[in-house]
Amino acid sequence: MSPWARRKMAMQFLYAMNFLHRRGVCHRDLSYRNVLVHTYRGSDAFMVKVSDFGLAKERGSDLTSTGSSMKGSIIDPALKSFRDFKPVNDIYSIGFILNYILTGKENLVTDGSRLGSIIQKCSATNSADRYRTVWDIIEDMRKAECPVG
């Protein structure tokens, strides 16, 4: 897949996550397997979908599932309790998925490129060093000239 197609795929994923977060929904179970790509036969077109909302939680809801198994999920090491999950915890996972979409690899980009810096900021170990919103990631992605890969 071309670097530009990967970039388009990454942006579709980010717009989907921005849609959720702007409506007060945290996914809480992001993994490589929960990002689906539908390709259209006979064309270069594709559609990215985020799936598996079994652990998703709306802001302000007292209902939460805390004992569920999160097989394959990318779990934020800064998260003290699943009950305290916030958008910034999804952003940690977003960094890893964004990296995978753009490079095809699970190892995080550390090359100092603009896109590498975006990925590093998403997946910073300290949540205070991360993007505050998915929209902020989208804005920085728009400024990045060329995708990695």
Feature roles, as predicted:
Residues 20-40:
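Catalytic-loop of the protein kinase fold
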Residues 49, 53-119:
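C-lobe/activation-segment region of protein kinase-like
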Residues 106, 127-128, 146:
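Activation segment of ePK-like protein kinases, specifically the conserved APE
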Residues 117-124, 140:
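Conserved C-lobe helical segment of Hanks-type protein kinase catalytic domains
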Residues 124-136:
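A conserved short helix/loop substructure at the end of the activation segment
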